[in-house]
Amino acid sequence: MWDEIFSAIKIERILEVGSFEGATVCYLIDKLGPKNNLEIYCIDTWEGGFEHKEQGKNMSTVESNFDENTNFAISNSKHSIALKKYKKTSAVALSTLLSEGKENYFDFVYIDGSHVASDVLCDAILGFKMLKHNGVMIFDDYLWTHSIELNIPLNPLDIPKIAIDAFINIYIRELRIMTAPLYQLFIQKK
């Protein structure tokens, strides 16, 4: 599905919420960097979510991996890549970008930050405000749940699906659902 999107719309400005080790942004650089210059904004606290803390993940290493991975991808790109890293909560970083005039600015928004429903809803609303008309937004972890991997009781407020569904229902007149593979949901702004 990603390749279909890349052939359907020209992507030059990218917003990623939740960057972790940079796998997605490096993929985007590898796929889109040969076509044109890119302006990329990556937002992450690099503190990890509760699931990372439960697993004992060293988030300093994760952030270092992000820096190394993105620097390598940028150095191998045919075109210019301007990557801006925001080490902040998504609510603060997204609000800052909006206050800097980034409304209707991005061609592509990828939401893969916190899994807590209230955070996901905030990311969706603010990210959508910054998405251009005909731009594409992808929600990762649509059906993610922590209960299986962490062996803790399921709390629907700690998973993305409830927030993504609420966002879709509220904004349905302003978007179209492109596809919904099991783990991701793709929308396009009208």
Q: What is each PLM-predicted segment?
A:
Residues 2-190:
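S-adenosylmethionine/decaboxylated-SAM
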